Amino acid sequence: MTTEITRPPAPPSRPSESRKPSLPGLLHLVAIAAVLATIVSAWAIDFVPTALIDGSDNIVALLQRMIPPRLDDPARIGMLAVETLLMAVLGTTLAAIASVPLAFLAARNTTPHPAVQAVARAVITFCRAMPDLLFAVLFVRALGIGVLPGVLALALHSIGMLGKVFADAIEQTDAGPREAVRSTGVGYFRELLNAVVPQVVPSWIAMFVYRIDINLRMSVVLGFVGAGGIGFALQDALRGLIYPRALGIVCVILVIIAGMELLAIAIRRILLDPSRSNPLRDRIARFGLSGVLVGSCVAAFVLLKINPLALFTWVFPSVGIFTRMVPPNFDALGVDLFTAAAQTVAIGVVATAIGIALSIPAGILAARNVSPHPALYWPARAWILVVRAVPELILAVVFVAALGLGPIAGTCALAIGSIGFLAKLVADAVEEIDPGPMEAVRSVGGGWWKTLFAAVLPQSMPALVGSSLYLFDVNVRTSTILGIVGAGGVGYLLFESIRTLNFDVAGAIVIVIFVIVYAIERLSGWIRSRLV
């Protein structure tokens, strides 16, 4: 009796902790669900390994027909390459300009009203959920063939990413500087400019540079729908079955994207990791890079022959196209629409599963602190870079030519493309782990494999799961546009409805795509919040 009276009470947090599933338990549940979803999805699209084995001869034959690569008109290809680069820079810059005020309205700690925050968040979510190629198709239909639809498509889709990241950065700022500035009696805008902006500029710059890198890859494929860039020449070569010319253009694209990635690394180092020994040099470099950005945007308007007024006048003809999509017509396609939508999700699931299986080994070998030998590290890094340089839509064209029309070609394209995305994230996550556990395992005689399974994977597992879920989100979004080249999914129905001017049917398909992408994004985000 006395023992019970003197026993200290249990902490109040204990019951809630006991009800919360452990991290290993959640990982097991997610793994089981992923395996079941992969099996069901593979069955739904008739994806079997024997299909790849049977089609391997066709793939090899197609690659042999591409060799040796050639450039029939180097001057024209060079101009299209410059056009592609300028489209990416201008589109990203316009998106950043639009995202800054939108982010302040969407951030919880800077929005003037909850209703304004909800509207701003809805705009950002819509731009992120709609694929850029879909925006490009609609703008080409509204404004005609040219680079302006491509620039606008890149800008609108980029708002979805930049706006969200910018708003998240604002919400994570320290409130202390704002209170100090507010105490001096300055207004609302001066408060934001003096107290919030200095805290978020580094993360904004990093994301802006990263988005240019992404948009350069995206601008390559916009030419497939007549939205300018080097993709138009690539599509022309593939349509004419001139495969050596197509491979030559792909090599040019590889050089451009690889160069841009190296330049982005250098820019981030200059802007975000200033040298303590020579601050004057860093200041000059920053002003110089700012001048290069402004000069590139001016050059984009001149060389791309874009009237600056078109940035404001595009709204009216585009609204005319969008209004023709309302009310949406779900009856025209009937059950075929939802069958194609289910196929889109299945393609994303299977491609993600294969991509994870291929990306984790490549990412581990590409991690400098874990790779067993430089002879494995550098080829792994090069392989990741090469795969990242080739957009999934181009891979889909190759697999359609080798394996035929259908979801299998789209699944293979997304699976290979996933390596460039996920393997890099895996390598970055592994390089950031604590070296202490690795040294402890090695100190007791543990070899490379023992170190990998006992020290590396346990530390990096949450990041691997989070990146894999994000890859699934990206793959489902990308699979919605692969239908443009006959690689399965709902994209084929969408582009056919737009081509035949059935905009009410296109409106129904757009709504279905939005619901799918938004639901997947929310689901993966919820799982990441539980695991990471």
UniProtKB/Swiss-Prot annotation:
GO molecular function: ABC-type phosphonate transporter activity
Residue ranges of the region described as Disordered: 1-20
Gene Ontology CC annotation, any one: plasma membrane
GO terms (BP aspect): phosphate ion transport
Keyword Transport: yes
Signal peptide (from-to): none
Name under which the protein is recorded: Phosphate-import permease protein PhnE
Taxonomic lineage from the root: Bacteria, Bacillati, Actinomycetota, Actinomycetes, Mycobacteriales
